Amino acid sequence: MVLATTLPDTTWTPSVGLVVILSNLFAIALGRYAIQSRGKGPGLPIALPALFEGFGLPELLATTSFGHLLAAGVVSVGLQYAGAL
Protein backbone atom coordinates (compact mmCIF):
# COMPACT_ATOMS: atom_id res chain seq x y z
CA MET A 1 0.00 0.00 0.00
CA VAL A 2 2.82 2.41 0.78
CA LEU A 3 4.49 1.72 -2.56
CA ALA A 4 1.28 2.53 -4.45
CA THR A 5 1.02 5.94 -2.80
CA THR A 6 4.64 6.96 -3.35
CA LEU A 7 5.13 6.14 -7.04
CA PRO A 8 3.80 8.64 -9.58
CA ASP A 9 1.09 7.56 -12.01
CA THR A 10 2.50 6.65 -15.42
CA THR A 11 0.60 7.75 -18.50
CA TRP A 12 1.17 6.00 -21.80
CA THR A 13 3.32 8.03 -24.19
CA PRO A 14 5.43 7.11 -27.22
CA SER A 15 8.56 7.35 -25.07
CA VAL A 16 7.13 4.74 -22.69
CA GLY A 17 6.44 2.51 -25.70
CA LEU A 18 10.01 2.99 -26.89
CA VAL A 19 11.33 1.93 -23.47
CA VAL A 20 9.17 -1.22 -23.60
CA ILE A 21 10.39 -2.07 -27.11
CA LEU A 22 14.04 -1.54 -26.15
CA SER A 23 13.59 -3.61 -22.99
CA ASN A 24 12.11 -6.46 -25.03
CA LEU A 25 14.93 -6.34 -27.57
CA PHE A 26 17.46 -6.39 -24.74
CA ALA A 27 15.71 -9.37 -23.13
CA ILE A 28 15.60 -11.28 -26.44
CA ALA A 29 19.30 -10.64 -27.02
CA LEU A 30 20.09 -11.73 -23.47
CA GLY A 31 17.89 -14.81 -23.78
CA ARG A 32 19.57 -15.80 -27.03
CA TYR A 33 22.78 -16.44 -25.12
CA ALA A 34 21.39 -17.32 -21.66
CA ILE A 35 18.88 -20.06 -22.56
CA GLN A 36 20.77 -23.34 -22.46
CA SER A 37 18.30 -25.81 -23.99
CA ARG A 38 16.71 -24.08 -26.96
CA GLY A 39 14.38 -25.55 -29.51
CA LYS A 40 12.56 -28.04 -27.28
CA GLY A 41 9.08 -26.69 -28.02
CA PRO A 42 7.18 -25.61 -31.12
CA GLY A 43 8.93 -23.31 -33.55
CA LEU A 44 7.78 -19.93 -34.75
CA PRO A 45 5.63 -19.80 -37.91
CA ILE A 46 8.01 -17.33 -39.56
CA ALA A 47 11.52 -17.78 -40.88
CA LEU A 48 14.21 -16.32 -38.66
CA PRO A 49 17.82 -15.39 -39.44
CA ALA A 50 20.48 -18.02 -38.72
CA LEU A 51 21.42 -16.09 -35.57
CA PHE A 52 18.16 -17.23 -33.95
CA GLU A 53 18.33 -20.89 -34.97
CA GLY A 54 16.47 -22.99 -32.40
CA PHE A 55 14.65 -19.94 -31.02
CA GLY A 56 11.03 -21.07 -30.82
CA LEU A 57 7.76 -20.07 -29.22
CA PRO A 58 8.74 -20.93 -25.60
CA GLU A 59 11.92 -18.87 -25.89
CA LEU A 60 10.04 -15.95 -27.43
CA LEU A 61 7.38 -16.01 -24.70
CA ALA A 62 9.99 -16.27 -21.94
CA THR A 63 12.16 -13.43 -23.22
CA THR A 64 9.30 -11.04 -24.00
CA SER A 65 7.74 -11.74 -20.60
CA PHE A 66 11.05 -10.85 -18.98
CA GLY A 67 11.28 -7.79 -21.24
CA HIS A 68 7.88 -6.54 -20.09
CA LEU A 69 8.80 -7.05 -16.42
CA LEU A 70 12.06 -5.23 -17.01
CA ALA A 71 10.25 -2.39 -18.79
CA ALA A 72 7.71 -2.04 -15.99
CA GLY A 73 10.51 -1.63 -13.50
CA VAL A 74 12.47 0.77 -15.69
CA VAL A 75 9.42 2.93 -16.46
CA SER A 76 7.62 3.06 -13.13
CA VAL A 77 10.45 2.78 -10.63
CA GLY A 78 13.32 4.22 -12.64
CA LEU A 79 12.52 6.82 -15.26
CA GLN A 80 9.10 8.00 -14.04
CA TYR A 81 10.28 8.40 -10.45
CA ALA A 82 13.37 10.30 -11.63
CA GLY A 83 11.18 12.57 -13.77
CA ALA A 84 12.74 11.51 -17.08
CA LEU A 85 9.40 10.37 -18.55
Swiss-Prot record:
Record keywords: Membrane, Photosynthesis, Photosystem I, Thylakoid, Transmembrane, Transmembrane helix
InterPro entries recorded: PSI_centre_PsaK_sf (IPR035982), PSI_PsaG/PsaK (IPR000549), PSI_PsaK (IPR017492), PSI_PsaK_bact (IPR037101)
An example Gene Ontology biological process: photosynthesis
Pfam families in the record: PSI_PSAK (PF01241)
Keyword Transmembrane helix tagged: yes
PROSITE patterns per UniProt: PHOTOSYSTEM_I_PSAGK (PS01026)
Transmembrane segment boundaries: 13-31, 69-85
Organism domain of life: Bacteria
Protein family: Belongs to the PsaG/PsaK family.
Protein's recorded name: Photosystem I reaction center subunit PsaK
Organism classification: Bacteria, Bacillati, Cyanobacteriota, Cyanophyceae, Thermostichales
